[in-house]
């Protein structure tokens, strides 16, 4: 593999940055495979549940599919908890950031906010506001635009 000669970014030449851009495009093209490989790590997270996070993710995607959601939403459902491993305190935002370049603004918003919506089922047991999601009740998702995809 060819490498650049510079050790400081300001010393890079056009040809070197063109080379790096090509490598970056190749790397970007492998993103889906890396994400699917990473999904395996969800088999060992969050003890105490009856199923693993991977099983939960597969169940969520299956439910979306059976509900006749579009392909984008099925994939988003599959990936909605990928942040649990590396960003447990903001897993929703992490997952949303990963999928943002590839999905509509609406789908991005749903993944980004799903952590707040799930609080409805448990937050009151922990002395927190279970109605956190209510702040969005007047929000209209109808006007959210479709994505300009990078691919």
Predicted segments — roles?
Residues 80, 114, 143:
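Histidine-centered divalent metal-coordination motifs
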Residues 84-88, 119-123:
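Secretory-pathway/luminal and periplasmic proteins that interact with or process carbohydrate-rich
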């Amino acid at each position: 593999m060819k490498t650049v000669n510079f050790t400081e970014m300001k010393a890079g030449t056009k040809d070197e940055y063109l080379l790096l851009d090509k490598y970056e495009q190749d790397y970007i093209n492998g993103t889906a495979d890396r994400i699917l490989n990473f999904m395996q790590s969800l088999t060992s997270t969050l003890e105490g549940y009856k199923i693993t996070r991977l099983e939960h993710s597969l169940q969520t995607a299956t439910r979306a599919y059976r509900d006749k959601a579009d392909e984008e939403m099925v994939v988003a459902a599959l990936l909605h908890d990928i942040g649990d491993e590396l960003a447990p305190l903001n897993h929703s935002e992490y997952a949303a950031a990963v999928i943002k370049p590839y999905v509509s603004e609406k789908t991005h918003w749903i993944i980004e906010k799903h952590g707040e919506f799930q609080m409805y089922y448990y937050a009151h047991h922990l002395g927190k506001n279970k109605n956190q999601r209510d702040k969005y009740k007047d929000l209209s998702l109808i006007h959210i635009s479709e994505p300009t995809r990078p691919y």
